[in-house]
Amino acid sequence: MRRFSASSFLLFACFLLTPAVLAETNVVLPFANLAKDQALDWVGESICENVAEALSAEGLLVLDREDRCEVYRRMSLRQYALLTRATVIKVGEALDADHVIFGQFSVSGEPSGRRSIRLAARVLDLTRLRQSIEFSYTAPLEDLASLQVSLAWEAYRYLRPQTARSEAEFKTSRQATRIDAMENYIRGLVAPTQEQRHRLFAQAARLDPNYSQPRFQLGRWHWERENYQIAADWLKQVAASDPHYRAAAFLLGLSRYQLGDYAGAEEAFAGIAKQIPVNEVFNNLGAAQARRDRPEALENFRRALEGDESDPVYHFNVGYALWRQGEFDVAADSFRAVLDRNSGDPEATLMLGRCLKRTRARSLDARSEAGPRLKQEFNETAYLQLKEMLEAKKQ
């Protein structure tokens, strides 16, 4: 069966779907801190982050923290301040969101003793200009994790009223997290320096061995610094239920590739391809397979190229696989396509020369030989948006 990239599917869907069934976008705002203690601001960020991640894990499109923070900055809004309904609407419109989840919390009791939290939230439907009833909860502060799951369930049920998923199933799939670990993780997300972020994420991971989110952040932190073995050690601990799981698997595949573990890289990319069949995943899967001299590499490079024929990386890799198979004339056409898009590409020039001279490939271990090119960025949003659009059409 022929497979298509997310971008190809999205283009095709535009001809099938009307605006009424386009995927809906959701945003969760940081909850206002009514406790008059700025040391508790992290609670408002925690509610926002965890509800957003829970909804995302259920397949809903939820805008990320960076987008929301940028709008707050542009509108000169203070994080964790109580917003009027009019301001909430303006934030949602600035983010082009269909639904906004917002609310506030208060904490009672002495810091040195047992404290309780009261949480209240609503879902605002911007397309119909109506909002849900208020969801409110009161519990000991140490039960914050379970309160967040309860709120996420209410929001999910409001946004997906026809869901067949039960509340018990929804909650069982989410492990409780120690509140001190959660606090360190959230403080890490908002920390001003990279060193502080790393220290707080590491502390969160140490406090709760089953806490997946800081493990993803630590893996990404080390990947960005080319500490590939340490990155791989963290990334392989990210739980399958974590909304960052596929991004973690992508970075894990890249880390293993850089470490020369091509079988492990192939395993990671193949796992993602089964869920999110997008260009960059097929490309990197093909690269790992090419390093193992597997014939499937060419097929996956061609799948990536089908999704975006304007990308010189995909043309290069198709040419590389054909050259290794001794298909010099066809490979030369691929390298010419690369040079049509980037005339100053030295590797493509070298490989075209080898094809014209009919120079055969040497050992895969030859470091002087140009190898397949990787994609470093993974974006599943377009594919998930398409999936959401098609699900909406079924309803």
Question: Which ranges hold each PLM region?
Answer:
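C-terminal/domain-edge helix-coil "capping" segments
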Residues: 23-27, 49, 57, 61, ...
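Short beta-strand->alpha-helix linker/helix-N-cap micro-motif
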Residues: 24-90, 94, 98-113, 130-133, ...
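Structural signature of tandem alpha-helical TPR/SEL1-like repeats
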Residues: 192-200, 224-237, 258-271, 277, ...
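Residue-level recognition of tetratricopeptide repeat
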Residues: 211, 245, 278-279, 311, ...
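TPR alpha-solenoid repeat register
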Residues: 214, 248, 281-282, 314, ...
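Terminal, low-structured helical/coil segments at or just beyond the last alpha-helical repeat
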Residues: 342-395
